[in-house]
């Protein structure tokens, strides 16, 4: 589709061929082998090397950042391929101290290969520069972070990484390519768990790497094929279907999340609210200004908050009392969910922090449920 049309229109029509007699929706292709005439189709010979469903999904995802995408069986599989492609020869993986714990687990597994994870507050550009220049490094960024929703300066990080000769990966799962484009800021690659907002219906586990670096794309494709981290055709079909409604969903979820964050900030039982774009007591207002500049169209569906008394028991009671919001993990689905995040092994979130994924229910209903859940003494 011509670039004259918006990203939203291109997503809706992704995977559809304007050919008379052909389906108006992308087909599901559950094939493990492909017909050849002596020479296999480029990229398709055996099912581990390609599938029309992946290719349609990858084209749509890449289009959001004017780049190319490689789909994987999960976000962790995508992360592993990136680390295996970029970490060799580097002593450090500099990553956020409050980022997704799965990334820390993967980075830690590279220690036997001579690479170690170095956690740092990515908002502190001077600290990031010190770590990147101390030894050959890979910068593994995440903004907003999960679950504290901290916002780091992508352009500033990219400049420091480039000066240090360090590739920069940005986990863009929370924002998606609609709300934030890391490659435009100078990132080497964007990383996604498509399980979350992109698929949007809590029925798919997939991941993706998006980049404009042809060499890196070839490397991660090779790791996908040789390592077997391929997406299933049905999962790719579901994710592409979800991607078509992402603009509508993310806009509503972002607006509702902002309203809920503001409501929670004034609640007597809430001691802290973590959400980009809102000014909070004790937080430098430049943080919200950066968020608004970096994510001008919204801040995504994820927020977190802390309650009094500050304990696991108090937070668990709030979560258990909900009548509409589901007590469940993950985020980005059409249904609202929440959980006490520190219940997961290895999670470094405050013990009483509740992470909430805002769905597409009417925000008035969500506020009603939140208020009655917070009535627990």
Please name every model-derived segment.
Residues 107, 118, 336-377:
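PLP-dependent enzyme catalytic core of the Aspartate aminotransferase-like
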Residues 270-354, 358:
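Conserved C-terminal alpha-helix-loop-beta "cap" of PLP-dependent enzymes
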């Amino acid at each position: 589709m011509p670039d004259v049309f918006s990203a939203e229109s291109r997503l809706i029509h992704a995977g559809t061929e304007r050919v008379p007699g052909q389906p108006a929706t992308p087909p599901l292709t559950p094939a493990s082998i492909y017909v050849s005439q002596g020479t296999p189709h480029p990229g398709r010979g055996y099912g581990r090397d390609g599938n029309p469903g992946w290719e349609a999904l990858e084209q749509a995802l890449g289009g959001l950042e004017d780049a190319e995408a490689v789909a994987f069986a999960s976000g962790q599989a995508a992360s592993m391929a990136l680390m295996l492609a970029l970490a060799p020869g580097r002593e450090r993986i500099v990553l956020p101290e409050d980022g997704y714990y799965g990334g820390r687990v993967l980075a830690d597994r590279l220690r036997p290969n001579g690479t170690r994870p170095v956690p740092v507050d990515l908002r502190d550009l001077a600290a990031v520069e010190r770590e990147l220049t101390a030894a050959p490094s890979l910068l593994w960024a995440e903004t907003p972070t999960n679950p504290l929703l901290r916002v780091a300066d992508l352009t500033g990080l990219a400049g420091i990484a480039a000066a240090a000769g360090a590739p920069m990966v940005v986990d863009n799962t929370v924002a998606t390519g609609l709300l934030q484009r890391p490659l435009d800021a100078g990132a080497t690659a964007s990383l996604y768990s498509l399980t979350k907002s992109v698929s949007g219906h809590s029925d798919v586990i997939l991941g993706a790497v998006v980049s404009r670096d042809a060499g890196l794309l070839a490397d991660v494709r090779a790791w996908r094929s040789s390592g077997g981290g391929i997406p299933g055709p049905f999962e790719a079909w579901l994710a592409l279907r979800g991607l078509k409604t992402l603009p509508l969903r993310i806009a509503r979820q972002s607006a509702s999340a902002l309203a809920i964050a503001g409501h929670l900030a004034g609640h007597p039982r809430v001691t802290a609210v973590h959400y980009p774009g809102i000014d909070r007591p004790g937080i430098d207002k430049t943080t919200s200004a950066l968020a608004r500049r970096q994510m001008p169209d919204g801040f995504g569906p994820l927020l977190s908050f802390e309650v009094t008394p500050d304990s696991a028991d108090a937070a668990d009671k709030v979560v258990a009392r909900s009548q509409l919001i589901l007590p469940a993990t993950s985020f980005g689905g059409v249904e609202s969910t929440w959980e006490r995040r520190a219940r997961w092994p290895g999670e470094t979130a405050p013990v009483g922090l509740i992470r909430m994924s805002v769905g597409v229910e009417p925000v008035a209903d969500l506020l009603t449920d939140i208020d009655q859940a917070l009535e627990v003494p």
